[in-house]
Amino acid sequence: MILTLFAFVLGGVVGSFLNVVIYRLPKKESIVAPPSHCPHCSHRLSALELIPIFSWIFQRGRCRHCGARISARYPLVEALTASLFALAARLQPDFPALLLVWVFMALLIALSFIDIDTYTLPDSLVYAGLALGWMASYLLKYPLAPQASVDSALMSAGLLALVAGYGALLVRRLKDGKREWPVGLHTMHLAGMVGAWSGPAAGLVAGFLNWALNARSKKVFALPDGLTLGLAALAPVAGYMVPGWLQSGLDSLRGLLVATGGLALAGGLYWAFRPEPEEDPNEVVVMGFGDVKLAGMLGAWLGFWPFLVGLMVAVLAGAVLGTAFRSRKVPFGPYLAIGGLVALFFGNRIVSWYLSYLGIG
């Protein structure tokens, strides 16, 4: 009970800080200075005006200095963070795992609200979460074993990158998408195709060699999307249907996902430090690439099979809440975050139950 109460209070304080992150990070402003202030009159907030949840209630949602309305979302973020921290303390009371869970939750909350506001997922938060998941796995063997964390991150990112690739290919009626220099979706499709036929290592090598060739030549060398994605889909089918094939169906599928995800996360990191390519208003986009990178982060923390549970929850939540909020377009990132939180605590149980239901658990 004491831990739960402490977690609630801590969550409120963290939620107050997350409000600063959500407001300032998309504007590329410092989250440290200047101190918290009214967004309308720039009045510096005192300690009494910074008490999570209660300050907003006592001030009736207005600035004490200028009387301007303060969005109800500020206490909402604080209350949500406080509640989730308390829930985590009840479900995962062991240290240091609980500290990592709190950080994971804080990242997802910040990413969700930034995505709602700007339809973007900041690379600084996504890759920080990915790196933290891998570091924790290597140093603490939590939340996953080291190799499992890396594989799951690559496979999860690869899955969503392929969903985006195949979806866009169908919408474009098998026409090629935009070619980006030196690395783009076509590079990931090539890596996935080679990985599906020859293993993940070969796929990664092929993808990075294509990237290097493009960079060296100042040109884009790319196979047709229909060819790379078609052959990538054919390899696992051949592995299942043809005895003694190059790879089993599962190994081929793993090679496809790992190679695609590896190039997706590496390419995303490259573009995080480079000027983003100009957007083509006519380019078909089935899923934002930020969601692909977020999938990698979730996979590093959850494992691939629990990530699939989270993805199913995200799709279901998107269908239900998307209908309820039909008047406003809500990005997929918050739904992935909801699915990730469900999978964090219940993903392995759901997977075990499903395998038992099938009689193979």
What are these regions (language model features)?
Residues 1-361:
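A membrane-topology feature that recognizes alpha-helical transmembrane segments
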